[in-house]
Regions:
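Hydrophobic ligand-binding cavity/cleft-lining segments
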Residues: 1-41, 45
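Short, charged low-complexity linear motifs
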Residues: 7-8, 19-20, 63-66, 106-118
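A conserved amphipathic terminal alpha-helix motif
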Residues: 110-145
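Juxtamembrane/interface motifs at transmembrane-helix termini
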Residues: 41-44, 52-54, 123-126
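Hydrophobic pocket/interface hotspot
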Residues: 21-22, 31, 50-52, 67, ...
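Hydrophobic-ligand binding "helix-grip"
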Residues: 41, 56-103, 109-112
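ATP/adenylate-binding site constellation spanning eukaryotic-like Ser/Thr protein kinases
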Residues: 36, 47, 72, 135
Length: 145
């Protein structure tokens, strides 16, 4: 993925409340149920940083996130890097109330080129991952609780 690429986006509307959606994307215990089961801690606070490992197809990817902006129940933004690999991105989550439901729009913008010739760093893999997380996994998690 290159910084000249347009952002990867995913969006979904959920039958839940803003507070429930905010909690699902900012509470580590809840994030483990739909997002990354190895994330051990998370705080929606500017400057908070977490590193956790994710294994994919026998390869270990140490995820490093740093929160750069958090507006309660409205906006969450963090940098996303993989320790040991070139490249960086910013993940932005925008929440909004839509009648009796709430919407989430996610944007993943590459800010430094991912240069490793791995399938996990291809745009299609990233698009598929965000589609799965936002449109399937989070939706199922929120609407079954």
């Amino acid at each position: 993925m290159k910084k000249t690429d347009p952002p990867i986006t995913a969006a979904q509307t959920y039958r839940t409340t803003l507070s429930d959606l905010w909690s699902a994307i900012t509470n580590a215990e809840r994030m483990r149920k739909w997002y990354f089961n190895t994330i051990h801690d998370f705080e929606a606070r500017e400057g908070f940083e977490v590193v956790f490992d994710v294994e994919c197809e026998g390869e270990n990817f140490p995820h490093r996130w740093k929160v750069t902006e958090a507006v309660f129940e409205k906006l969450l933004k963090y940098t996303w890097k993989f320790d040991g690999y070139d490249g960086a991105a910013t993940a932005t989550f925008r929440l909004d109330k839509e009648g009796e439901a709430v919407s989430l729009a996610v944007s993943f913008q590459t800010t430094e080129d991912f240069t490793a010739p791995l399938p996990q760093f291809q745009r299609e893999a990233c698009q598929g991952g965000w589609k799965y997380f936002i449109e399937e996994s989070l939706k199922s998690y929120l609407e079954s609780n």
